[in-house]
Amino acid sequence: MWAQAARVQFRAPLDRGRSFASKVGPRGKVQAADPKTQAPRLVPEGTDRVSAAVVEHLERLALVNFSSREAVDRLEKAVAFADQLHAVDTDGVEPLESVLEDRCLYLRSDKVAEGGCAEELLQNSNHVVEEYFVAPPGNIPLPDMVGKVPSSTAE
């Protein structure tokens, strides 16, 4: 009982975060969002092709190279599959804050444990510098090296 009351109290601040699909007021009434606030479509209405500008933009954001026609075709198929969600009738469906909102989830107790196990934990890492984990570089765009001759630095 108290968990349900606590969940209701925490719902109100979360309503501010919804902006694309619907607007939920403090009483839970769903209103359609303004079409101007909808996310832009990758594929224009009535076509099944992704424009070159969108492909270039996605390449910069995701650091993925769509140089082959096969990659662009796969992207277009993925967008067409995702566009099927627009056909789903969601009238009368209450928006979810979490898929687990019908369950009472309990937190574990916060117990202080003995420390001093840094050496043991650092043994799990491939690369350590001054008692810190070193992560590999993420998606860093590298210059295109095709056709370039490496310059010699020793003269």
Curated annotation (Swiss-Prot):
Region described as Disordered: 19-42
InterPro entries membership: Asp/Glu-ADT_sf_sub_c (IPR036113), GatC (IPR003837)
Presequence extent in this chain: 1-20
Cystine pairs: none
Pfam families per record: GatC
Enzyme Commission number(s): 6.3.5.-
GO cellular component: glutamyl-tRNA(Gln) amidotransferase complex; mitochondrion
Keywords, alphabetical: ATP-binding, Ligase, Mitochondrion, Nucleotide-binding, Protein biosynthesis, Transit peptide
GO MF term (any one): ATP binding
Superkingdom as given in the UniProt entry: Eukaryota
GO biological process, one term: regulation of translational fidelity
Reaction(s) the record says it catalyses: L-glutamyl-tRNA(Gln) + L-glutamine + ATP + H2O = L-glutaminyl-tRNA(Gln) + L-glutamate + ADP + phosphate + H(+)
Annotated compartments: Mitochondrion
PANTHER family, per the entry: GLUTAMYL-TRNA(GLN) AMIDOTRANSFERASE SUBUNIT C, MITOCHONDRIAL (PTHR15004:SF0)
Similarity comment: family membership: Belongs to the GatC family.
Subunit structure: Subunit of the heterotrimeric GatCAB amidotransferase (AdT) complex, composed of A (QRSL1), B (GATB) and C (GATC) subunits.
Function: Allows the formation of correctly charged Gln-tRNA(Gln) through the transamidation of misacylated Glu-tRNA(Gln) in the mitochondria. The reaction takes place in the presence of glutamine and ATP through an activated gamma-phospho-Glu-tRNA(Gln).
Name of the molecule in the record: Glutamyl-tRNA(Gln) amidotransferase subunit C, mitochondrial
Organism: Rattus norvegicus
Gene: Gatc
